[in-house]
């Protein structure tokens, strides 16, 4: 990996950037941003798909598969955390003396050009909260630059390049990526054990988030969830002042008051330092989304946005792509898709789903990575015993090889009545067989489980 300070000399018009893993959720928007800055952009990915097709429509060439020849005459390489040193493009670049930078280094360098860098982190809730903040700052007419790890309907993509002085960036802890950022406002939603293929344990994860908070300069702000034990532990004794948000703890600077639930959707007042700030009516359900809204509102307050902008922005937010996203109806059963791939995210999703007026919850779950499934096995079992019916797809490998001999079959043995499906086609068939009018069908996971739901809906037609 090349030193981050060196990347600034490469992010100039006319330079040619090769992005290895260009179709990824934060790589494809990076490709577009660099393209918009006047760089020549090319890349490669193991899989074709909508993001790759979109990049090609912009005139960005994308090769499928990784090979040293893909580098062409590029000036530098940017890679995702999933692209390792033994990848032929990385080893080829090293052999030729072409500098290799991490994706986070590129985003960090871009971030340095903004007065306000709002970086939103947490084990889960990052995409939703970043999307909420985007709605608020757009309502406040701040014209922000945005990088989200998902698709936001407001933007019709996962990014935008604004002309304002604020950048809003989803900030991931995996491989300490967010430590390459330059936050002026660092938001920490929650801290739990995850990415245990990289981190040793929860204490290691907490240490990473603490280092992230310590990046905030004097005059900046650390915003954190007082209701989350991991966040409190990570920040205990830190020198930076902390702006806490909470559902109802009076010790927090920001909290919700007068919460009313109507058909599973919350409306509430936001009080900051004891004074009324904003009224919010959310169009997404779940207590976790109240917390996400409080986090986004806290950041907006600290950066000078009005309470009116907060209320208006959040009133128009209907969810981010793959976050309880309505896909359609199959013989009277509603089909939703969600990105949840950690037990904490599953818990929040299923708790929210239980408040909705469906006869049964059918959850088609695809675990994401072998190491996460093994490390959090008992937690997954606990959460997957909540739905009325569970259909288990095989584990989505992502960046891993199955060297530990684990399978979704192992989960199925611990979940009474569950159905194990080795292929997505079998998941679709199982859902078609099981579903009844009035059911809620959830396709859940960070891999390609959504395809099973989409195929189910095609069968309806």
Where are the predicted features?
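N-terminal leader/targeting and accessory segments in enzymes
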Residues: 1-102, 106, 229, 257, ...
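Phosphate-binding loop of NTP-binding sites
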Residues: 8, 33-36, 56, 70, ...
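Nucleotide phosphate-binding/pyrophosphate-handling subdomain across enzymes
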Residues: 10-18, 26, 30-33, 37, ...
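Short internal beta-strands
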Residues: 39-46, 222-226, 362-366, 387-397
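Beta-strand->loop->alpha-helix junctions that form or flank phosphate-binding loops
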Residues: 44-45, 63-66, 101-108, 147-150, ...
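C-terminal helical cap/extension that packs against the catalytic core
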Residues: 381-437
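A glycine-rich beta-strand to alpha-helix segment
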Residues: 426-458
């Amino acid at each position: 990996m090349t030193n981050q300070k060196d990347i600034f000399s490469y992010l100039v018009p006319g330079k040619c950037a090769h992005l290895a893993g260009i179709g990824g959720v934060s790589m494809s928007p990076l490709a577009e941003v660099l393209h918009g800055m006047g760089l020549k952009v090319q890349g490669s990915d193991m899989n074709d798909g909508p993001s790759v097709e979109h990049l090609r429509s912009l005139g960005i060439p994308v090769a499928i598969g990784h090979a040293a020849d893909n580098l062409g005459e590029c000036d530098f390489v940017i890679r995702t955390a999933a692209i390792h040193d033994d990848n032929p493009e990385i080893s080829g670049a090293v052999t030729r003396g072409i500098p290799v930078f991490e994706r986070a280094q590129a985003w960090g360098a871009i971030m340095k050009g903004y007065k306000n860098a709002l970086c939103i982190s947490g084990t889960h809730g990052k995409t939703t909260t970043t999307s909420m903040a985007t709605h608020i700052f757009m309502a406040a007419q701040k014209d922000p630059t945005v990088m989200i790890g998902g698709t936001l309907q407001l933007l019709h993509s996962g990014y935008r390049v604004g002309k304002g002085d604020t950048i809003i960036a989803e900030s991931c802890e995996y491989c300490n990526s967010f430590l390459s950022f330059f936050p002026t406002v660092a938001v920490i939603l929650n801290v739990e054990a995850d990415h245990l293929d990289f981190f040793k344990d929860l204490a290691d994860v907490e240490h990473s988030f603490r280092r992230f908070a310590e990046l905030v300069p004097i005059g900046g702000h650390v915003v954190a969830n007082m209701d989350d034990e991991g966040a409190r532990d990570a920040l205990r004794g830190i020198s930076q002042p902390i702006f806490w948000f909470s559902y109802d703890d009076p010790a927090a600077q920001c909290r919700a008051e007068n919460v009313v639930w109507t058909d599973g959707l919350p409306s509430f007042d936001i009080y900051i330092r004891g004074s009324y700030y904003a009224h919010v009516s959310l169009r997404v359900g779940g207590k976790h989304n109240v917390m996400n809204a409080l986090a986004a509102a806290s950041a907006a307050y600290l950066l000078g946005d009005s309470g009116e902008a907060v209320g208006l922005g959040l009133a128009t937010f209907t969810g981010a792509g793959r976050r309880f996203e309505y896909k359609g109806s199959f013989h009277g059963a509603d089909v939703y898709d969600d990105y949840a791939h950690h037990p904490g995210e599953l818990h929040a999703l299923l708790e929210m789903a239980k408040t909705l007026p469906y006869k049964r919850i059918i959850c088609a779950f695809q675990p994401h990575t072998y190491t996460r499934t093994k490390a959090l096995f008992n937690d997954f079992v606990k959460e997957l015993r909540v739905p009325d019916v569970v259909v288990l797809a095989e584990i989505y490998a992502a960046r891993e090889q199955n060297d530990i001999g684990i399978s979704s079959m192992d989960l199925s043995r611990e979940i009474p009545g569950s159905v194990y499906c080795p292929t997505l086609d079998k998941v679709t068939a199982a859902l078609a067989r099981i579903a009844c009018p009035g059911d809620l069908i959830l396709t859940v996971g960070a891999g390609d489980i959504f395809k099973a739901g989409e195929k189910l809906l095609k069968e309806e037609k």
